[in-house]
């Protein structure tokens, strides 16, 4: 086990260069719009920034997707995160690409520390970092526009501090901060669930190997502390998801025959299809692992099996998990019956951790071979081993450049921004254009935790902004901003009006009149005569979450003070 201070000065510089290399295909077209899910995630980065900059409001609600949906407490939306500053300063298109750059740097650095925690050399630590965080798997997801996957950069940091905290108990604080940053950013859904599954299982296996419960105890403590710090977002989000469950794919599976293409094939692109049962595009499957890395991993298992068997179990478990539902006892079938994991889809995302486990074993195997060869003094053999390491790294670099170069194919378009917001129907995949035009996209891509699209659409495709359900009334004026809707109404009679905005229990009328959901849309009663109706949105349970976050911060601050305070000499 090593200390943070053991990092050589050249290592951070190397990781900065690697991060620039991986992000460069995006940075070379820094203002271009991305393909596929870039449209969706560029939009949900732009909306909170625009809510602050255009309206001076806190980003509680997103009126721009699917007829209106949650924003602040959505698990894949960044607000209370340092990355939000990038969106505010540079805009969402450029800000997300800078986020990729930063996250690659953090991911390489954290991966290096995690490897060093298991006793590998500096060179082997670099090998692990590039074999794992520089893998095809991450390049495919980032090229696809899956911004939540950038927040896997905090996984190795969380795991590292949890593992090291059995010697330095206060490092639980650093683990908690890593988890907090993941949740407050884009990583509160898939990355969070898999990070806790991976780290928890690793701690159990290490505890069994070493006969210690400290790993698991520290993992639980760090998880509670991290989620406590992030409770201002996490708690409202969990309550929302419990009340509005979104379905996963419990029956999804990958045929065993596809594993060769997935792990050892040389054709990895966003636009390829390799097997008939391929449900998703290739970004959900590609997990290239160099055969040379596998050979090094096998070396570690042959020579140090009693010490390294936990990594073999990890690789086997996540391989089986990635295969999906192949029977009642399959890990996927079991886990998707549990809360939290029940909403998962894309079984191939579990292959991420097969790469991690094999890369760790490969780094250990590299060191073992180098140690043996240093004794034998075989120069040729040492050259061959180092060339193998260079080949592993070089292959990932080449694959990643080609894949990430596929991300940007659309130069920016000039879009006129309308003064008044309206819901509208446009071609799917144009949500960001709709946002720039100040139009809500009723036809938008599916997003985790969002309600299905809802709106007032007539049989001939006309989109209404409101509809008088009962009685008679005239809307003299309306002003719709993200968190506030204001209607100037003249009612000929009393009645009820349905708005074109999706209902959520966070909406409330300023004058206390009751609101109800009609076909998923906000409905309110109006009276006879002139009246102004103001509807405001606030994230439900926000203050409860904030109280838990502040209490967690105070508790961890007390722990830090207790550990760091100087002791009196006797």
Question: Residue spans of the language-model regions?
Answer:
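Periplasmic/ER-lumenal interhelical loops and adjacent helix-loop junctions
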Residues: 40-53, 57-60, 216-219, 223-301, ...
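Membrane-interface coil-to-helix junctions
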Residues: 18-108, 130-152, 254-279, 324-332, ...
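Active-site-proximal, structured, solvent-exposed surfaces of multi-pass membrane proteins
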Residues: 461-570
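Start-transfer (signal-anchor) and selected internal transmembrane alpha helices
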Residues: 1-25, 218, 383-390, 554-570
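Signature aromatic-anchored transmembrane alpha helix within multi-pass, membrane-resident enzymes
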Residues: 220-227, 360, 366-401
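Membrane-embedded helix bundles of polyisoprenyl
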Residues: 15-18, 106-118, 122-207, 218-237, ...
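Hydrophobic, aromatic-rich transmembrane alpha-helices
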Residues: 2, 204, 289-320, 557-560
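Transmembrane alpha-helical segments
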Residues: 107-114, 154-166, 200-205, 294-301, ...
């Amino acid at each position: 086990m090593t200390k943070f201070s053991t990092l050589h000065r050249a290592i951070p510089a190397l990781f900065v260069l690697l991060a620039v290399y991986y992000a460069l295909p995006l940075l070379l077209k820094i203002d271009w719009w991305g393909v596929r899910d870039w449209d969706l995630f560029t939009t949900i980065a732009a909306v909170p920034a625009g809510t602050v900059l255009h309206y001076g409001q806190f980003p509680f609600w997103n009126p721009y997707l699917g007829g209106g949906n949650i924003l602040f407490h959505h698990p894949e939306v960044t607000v209370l995160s340092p990355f939000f500053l990038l969106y505010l300063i540079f805009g969402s298109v450029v800000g997300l690409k800078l986020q990729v750059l930063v996250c690659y740097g953090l991911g390489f650095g954290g991966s290096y520390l995690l490897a060093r925690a298991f006793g590998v050399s500096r060179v082997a630590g670099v090998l692990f970092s590039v074999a794992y965080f520089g893998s095809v798997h991450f390049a495919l997801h980032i090229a696809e526009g899956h911004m939540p996957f950038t927040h896997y950069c905090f996984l190795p940091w969380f795991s590292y501090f949890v593992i090291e905290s059995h010697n330095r108990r206060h490092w639980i604080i650093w683990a908690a901060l890593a988890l907090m940053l993941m949740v407050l950013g884009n990583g509160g859904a898939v990355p969070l669930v898999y990070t806790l599954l991976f780290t928890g299982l690793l701690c159990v296996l290490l505890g069994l190997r070493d006969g210690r419960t400290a790993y698991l105890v520290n993992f639980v403590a760090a998880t509670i502390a991290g989620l406590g710090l992030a409770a201002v977002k996490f708690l409202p989000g969990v309550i929302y998801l419990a009340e509005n469950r979104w379905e996963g794919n419990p029956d999804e599976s990958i045929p065993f025959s596809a594993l060769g293409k997935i792990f050892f094939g040389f054709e990895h692109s966003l636009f390829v299809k390799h097997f008939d049962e391929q449900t998703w595009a290739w970004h959900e499957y590609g997990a290239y692992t160099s055969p040379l890395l596998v050979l090094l991993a096998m070396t570690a298992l042959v020579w140090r099996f009693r010490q390294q068997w936990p990594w073999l179990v990890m690789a086997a478990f996540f391989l089986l998990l990635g295969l999906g539902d192949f029977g009642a006892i399959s890990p996927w079938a079991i886990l998707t019956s549990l809360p939290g994991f029940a909403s998962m889809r894309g079984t191939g995302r579990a292959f991420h951790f097969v790469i991690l486990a094999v890369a760790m074993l490969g780094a250990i195997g590299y060191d073992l071979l180098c140690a043996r060869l240093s004794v034998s003094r075989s120069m040729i053999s040492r050259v061959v081993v180092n060339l193998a390491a260079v080949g592993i790294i070089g292959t990932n670099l080449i694959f990643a450049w080609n894949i990430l170069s596929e991300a940007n194919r659309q130069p920016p378009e000039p879009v006129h921004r309308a003064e008044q917001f309206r819901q509208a129907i446009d071609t799917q995949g144009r949500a960001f254009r709709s946002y720039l035009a100040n139009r809500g996209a009723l036809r938008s891509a599916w997003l985790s935790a969002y309600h299905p699209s809802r709106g007032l659409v007539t049989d001939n495709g006309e989109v209404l902004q409101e509809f008088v359900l009962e009685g008679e009334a005239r809307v003299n004026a309306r002003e719709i901003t993200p968190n506030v809707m204001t209607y100037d109404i003249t009612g000929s009679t009393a009645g009820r009006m349905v708005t074109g905005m999706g209902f959520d229990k966070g909406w409330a009328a300023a004058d206390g009149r009751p609101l109800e959901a009609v076909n998923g849309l906000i409905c309110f009663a109006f009276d006879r005569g002139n009246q102004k109706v103001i509807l405001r949105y606030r994230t439900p349970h926000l203050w409860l979450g904030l109280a838990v976050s502040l209490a967690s911060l105070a508790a961890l601050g007390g722990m830090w003070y207790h550990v760091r305070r100087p002791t009196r000499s006797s």
